[in-house]
């Protein structure tokens, strides 16, 4: 009975999310229904013994309050600090300076499709400092896209490479990485170094080759003629105010160092390098913002304007709270509902009885997240919703939580780039003047290679 009830709620919630209902609201409502059903049918409890308010209907809201309190003081503040810093870097043009500086060595290469693949690899490493897939794609469309097309690459091939440059959310300051590290029980830097880097080392060269072959073959199939153009002749559609600012911003070259300050601080003062000095993500982001603010004052000589621009940092924090942290909390609330009905225990027991085991459950969850990421156009929403189930499943199946959460997180970001409705695809295709549906035909093969390699590498290296 409990399995049937849970299945109906889960299917209903999935249908609503696919119909573009607000994911946070759907997860909160579905989680509340599961908890209510669990209490009415005496399948489980909502709060631990001694924590109840005395009325189970009140316990549901007390659980939400507890989740908000716990998440906002730890994981939530980390995510908000990262979001605020990223917005401030965009505001002062530091992200643009970093991209403009790092693409210069690529000018020395003459083969159009090698330059295109190298641009994709460069974008993957830029993603360590610039965590927004859409933001990074926008910057590369303004700076690198005209160069690629001028070398002879077709507009759609250049856009496909740029739109997939952050197909692995593998930065230690990425919101998904921070969350995955907490689920796995590791410091974000240790998690990044121990688990994400080995996967990235397997994925990056293979996807670069896949891009080279896919785009070259499909350009030839479509009758594209490789010929050099003047970069000034290559048009880029700049429609939004943010895109205009990114295109017109010409910050000092030294600003290229500002986005990497927090990353450098996190890595240097970590157990990997200098374990005697403590550094956390929030401190690194605040220090990076303070240094950037000083640099901005010397650039503008306007103290009032410099102080005023810091509002962007706070706005960025608020945006992360509204868009990311609420999904994390809603997903955790939904997971509590699933657990309270006993469905997770039943699923694990069924898997063990049939010999499916932890590996089979991991593959099923990976597949669900990949499909949801494509249909929803978001990697974070399905990952944050399902990742909260990992600790319970891992504990009862005897595998490390990192073995399950690692491919779930990375698959979400790769599958996202196959969706025609995801932000990065819409931004890149709009600036290139092509259809997002045509674009995902070019991103599908390289991203499929990425997804397969993530799973295989995870099983080979950590299985």
Region locations from a protein language model:
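Hydrophobic alpha-helical transmembrane segments of multi-pass integral membrane proteins
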Residues: 78-81, 108-143, 328-333, 354-392, ...
